[in-house]
Curated annotation (Swiss-Prot):
The keyword DNA damage applies. This is DNA mismatch repair protein MutL. Transmembrane segments: none annotated. GO terms for biological process: mismatch repair. It comes from the Bacteria. It holds the Pfam family HATPase_c_3.
Amino acid sequence: MAIILLDTKTINRIAAGEVIERPASVVKELVENAIDAGSLEIEIKIESGGRNLIIVTDDGNGVEKNDLELAFMRHATSKLSDSELIEIKHLGFRGEALPSIAAVSRIKLSSKAREASEAWSISYEGGEKIGEQTPYSLSQGTHIEVRDLFFATPNRLKFLKTERAETQSIVDIVNNLAMINYHIGFTLTSGNKKLLKYAKQTSLFHRLCEVEEEFQGSSLEINEEEDGIKLTGHICKPTVNRGKSTQIYTFVNGRPIKDNLLIGAVRYAYHDFIPSDRYPFAALHLEIPYDQVDVNVHPNKSEVRFQNKKLIYEIMTRGLIKALSRRIGTFPAHDQKMDSTLPDPFDKPDVQNERRPSPFENQLIKEFASPNEKAKGLSEQSKSFDYTGIQKFPAQAEAMVLEKKVLEQVDLIESHPLGFARCQVYNTYIIAEVRDKLIIVDQHAAHERLVYECLKQKSSIKRQKLLLPETVEIKNQAGMEMIEIYKDKLFEMGFDIEIKSENKVIVKEIPAILGAIDVKEMLINIIDRLTEIEDTLPVEDKVNKILATIACHGSIRAGRKMRLDEMNELLRQMEKTPYSGQCNHGRPTYIEMKLSDIEKLFERR
């Protein structure tokens, strides 16, 4: 078969397949052109999800009359010269958008340049010019109408989704462009319905709150820089999450980008705080030297190529983790390691025996007594206190401890952000009082995070020998393989496991922090978790997932009645533990109720 040279019309239609995939692609290209033209107001109108009509109007610099026809020639652009190919600062630069759109639709471009006396219009249909340029009524900028998209390539229409889905895709595109270009006003209308209306803003955060209201009141600011690469933006607390990644907005040098490296960095930073099938809210802008990033990868310009992927990933994860560690909990993360030798405060007391002061009461007394000089006498008083009375009259004794040891030391409240426990409700929630608010703590969620963070400090984990080693039967070969593979890692986590036979193991030691647990159930759950984890995950991530499983099963359960000393010790440990504001599944461990809000409920304000 002879080789032939394709005509321009056919070439444009083939090229349009890469640039114009759906109506949202048209909106993206036209709005990017409007942004590059220096517009301050951009209005988009669509009908039937963009299939029948797309109109984009802006107040930008406009196009000169003599350049109107040139704008529809492939690779004709006003934004790029030979010397600028390495430093591409415009959203559009390839000169492919208008000819690609014109090849598959009916398009009319009307524009008035800033210094021009009148506006002019030009029309194309299926890639061919229709008539001559005509005068047009337009005060400033550009007005583009795109009708009957894909009429020239009807096969493409079969691949479009429903009108609702195509409309949502356009909304997503406009939101992305509006987010980073916060200094521009945007309006999007479908038929007679206004879908979006964003006024010009002075900062990314203000626009962010317009686009995603979840950022209002839940935003954490990001600011990280290294080797000329700067990361800025905002993320939401882990409790604000969704089942899709559409609320992760990433930008590179002002350009909306969907990149697996960036999404992966965000997910890694949150992996300790939300389930693996959930995604956080984030809007992040990377400013990278132009010679270290290539945006000329694909005609739709939504992909980039980084020169130093490792550095980008490190900056992203470090910046996010810093922000999360500052905000998760109202207190800063402490650098010191947790005391993993601390016994479990939630074992039920033996009511038949004389009760002696628990390590947690002693620890609580130490907390009260130091470093405040006014509280020095507290530990001395405790030596002569009749702890047996607590067993005989628990309610009265606890009230007495509270009255004499806590309420008399009001000044200590200021040094404890979570205040002091007042009661427990539904055997699940701890009510604590601070000077100007109430704190409500989910005891299981809080203790789960404490145990998890303690287990992660592997070098300080203390083991507890079982009085009677537990023999566990493993019923499948895959389970035994997991034990053999991870035996050493489990030892680092505090488990001493000996393989006895082909299907049996002996558990001799467990982490002391877990206290009294069902060892067999725990080991079976660990094995199940190991078999579920993807082989491609890094070893450290696998270990953390195992630790999360251990922490969940080794934590105090909802429905467990607690004493005041136990509640207060839990609060003190939360104050000293990193990330204690969130459990391992992304739920909050506590909430706050301000006194002013309570007073409003009773109409005192």
